[in-house]
Amino acid sequence: VEAQAVAQAYSDTMLGEKQTLVGNAIAQKCEETLFNYSHLAVADAEAHVVTPAFSNIVEANTLMSGLGFESGGLSGAHAIHDGLTILEETHDLTHGEKVAYGTLTQLMLEGADQERYNKYFQFILSLGLPTTLADLHLENVTDEELLNAGKAACSEQDTMDRLPFKVTPDDVAQALRAVDAYTKQYLNSHHCHHSQM
């Protein structure tokens, strides 16, 4: 999602250069690998076994994501992660948990259509990653706190400006709440139970 946004905006990567064909190919292969092998790899990890699926996910999460971040670029999801880190309640969550919620938030900011949004939402939900503010331990978060997270996400030192449109701190705060509201509506309409992380 982030590398696609960087490409659309013709923004620089983390190396201060334009994306390379290889960087985009790595980002696409990383996403493909995550979608194809994550559920198998989680089951393998729980069973304490190393299988090709598990190894593929390790490669995607280390080598491909590292090369992809350098050559493909980061944008909204990681900036949102950084914004969330100013909220003490999120400190015990992993980097990946905050980036997962950041990805959904970036898609909200982009105005992704329901099909595109649901592709990532259902994947993130199925892995038990955060899809609500409560999952981030932010069930009682104030509008001011979300606005402060938005300010941190939009700081000049971060990567929000690599999106192909302008984003304000208020946009981020509203999108963080929109992800939460969408999840609750989705779970209610599908009669699903969602356990807090």
Regions found by a protein language model. Give the residues of each.
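Conserved anion/nucleotide-ligand pocket segment
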Residues: 1-8
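C-terminal charged capping/lid subdomain of soluble metabolic enzymes
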Residues: 112-197
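Active-site segments that bind and position negatively charged phosphate/pyrophosphate groups
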Residues: 9-129
